[in-house]
Amino acid sequence: MNKSSILLYHGVTKEKNSVGIENCSGKHMDADVFEQQMKYISENKNVITLRELVRLIEADEPCPPDCVAVTFDDSFKNIRTVALPILKKYNVPATFFITTAMVGNNRLFWVDRLEHTINRTDKKLLCLEGKYYTLRTSTDKIDTLTKVKRMLKSERPSKRNTVLK
C-alpha cells in the first residue's frame, strides 16, 4: 500500500490581527497560507475524498501515489465563507465533520468561550476549584488556558457551563 496523508483543518481566517491570545492554539489558519497549500496539493498530489481513502484501505487496495485527503473538524462559519471558495477554486474535495449542536445558533464551542473569556478579562488572578491562576500577561493567560482546558475536557458539559459563567 502506498502512503497517504490526511490534512486536518479547523478553520481558515482572513483576520490578520489577533487580539491578545485569540487563536493562540493556531486552530484557524491564515487564508493565504491555506490557499498556497491547496494550490500545491492540487498541482502536486493525488487529492481524493476521505471516503475513497477509507474504501481503498478497507479493500486492501493501493492508494494512488502521493495520496492526500482534506478534512475539517468543527463547524466554524469561516469554513463556508473562506475555505470553501478556495477549495472550489483548486477543485480540492474535502470532508466536513460538522458539530450539529452548533448549527443554526451563534454560540461558541466551550473551548472558544474559554479562550475568549480568559483573553478579555481584566482580572489578574483566577480562582477555580481551589487553584489560583495568574492572568497578568499573555503568557500567563495562555498557560492558564492550557491548564483549564485540560481540566475541563474530562468534565461533563453542565460542569463546563457552570465554570464558564
Regions picked out by a protein language model, each given a short descriptive name:
Residues 4-6, 67-69, 93-95:
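Structural preference for beta-strand elements that scaffold enzyme active sites
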Residues 7, 41, 73, 87, ...:
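Conserved, mostly hydrophobic/aromatic
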Residues 11-14, 53-55, 75-77, 101-104:
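Short, solvent-exposed loop/turn segments at secondary-structure junctions
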Residues 14-29:
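Acidic/histidine-rich helix-loop elements
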Residues 71, 75-84:
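Membrane-embedded segments
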Residues 107-165:
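Extended, charge-rich helix/loop segments that form flexible
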